[in-house]
Amino acid sequence: MTLETAFMLPVQDAQHSFRRLLKAMSEPGVIVALHQLKRGWQPLNIATTSVLLTLADNDTPVWLSTPLNNDIVNQSLRFHTNAPLVSQPEQATFAVTDEAISSEQLNALSTGTAVAPEAGATLILQVASLSGGRMLRLTGAGIAEERMIAPQLPECILHELTERPHPFPLGIDLILTCGERLLAIPRTTHVEVC
């Protein structure tokens, strides 16, 4: 069995990462950095690995897309978080993928129900860059007036964000990661292409 390292100071590092994630989720579009790890569990980047170490546990099934799924990641995730790994995206609380995500995989993610909207999945999407893409205007909770971002996104994700095909409060929350940095776009955020 080959394992990757986790946080050096598990409690303090997880608390720090949680506070940074809370900032990102409560202030959509704000980029935060997670510096607790020296490296991610390849092919996962530092931010994705940190999010999983901070949020995943035995009650949160994790789905890893094929490009990001390997034995070392699986063993490390099971050992450090005890999170169950699932083979289908619709079973996941946390879905982890990269820009190769298909519309079918995205549409399979749980969006919750009217009775249990919190059952909607969180999609952790590794992107090439958090800048240099189409300019997006974010409005809504946690944003004073508007916030502009330009991450490089696959078309299916852009469509999901701008169309929001599910009535609120249903939907998915999105965390975009690149290296040790991330930004979040919760389902409460309204997104427009500029």
UniProtKB/Swiss-Prot annotation:
NCBIfam families: PhnH_redo. Together with PhnG, PhnI and PhnL is required for the transfer of the ribose triphosphate moiety from ATP to methyl phosphonate. Its EC number is 2.7.8.37. Pfam families: PhnH. GO terms for cellular component: alpha-D-ribose 1-methylphosphonate 5-triphosphate synthase complex; carbon phosphorus lyase complex. It is an enzyme of class 2 (transferase). Belongs to the PhnH family. It comes from Escherichia coli (strain K12). This is Alpha-D-ribose 1-methylphosphonate 5-triphosphate synthase subunit PhnH. The sequence shown is that of strains K12 and B. Gene3D superfamilies: Bacterial phosphonate metabolism protein PhnH (3.40.50.11310). Transmembrane segments: none annotated. Homodimer. Forms a complex with PhnG, PhnI, PhnJ and PhnK with the suggested composition PhnG(4)H(2)I(2)J(2)K. It catalyses: methylphosphonate + ATP = alpha-D-ribose 1-methylphosphonate 5-triphosphate + adenine. Keywords: Transferase. Disulfide bonds: none annotated. GO terms for molecular function: alpha-D-ribose 1-methylphosphonate 5-triphosphate synthase activity; identical protein binding; protein homodimerization activity. InterPro entries: PhnH-like_sp, Phosphonate_metab_PhnH. One of its GO terms (biological process) is organic phosphonate catabolic process.
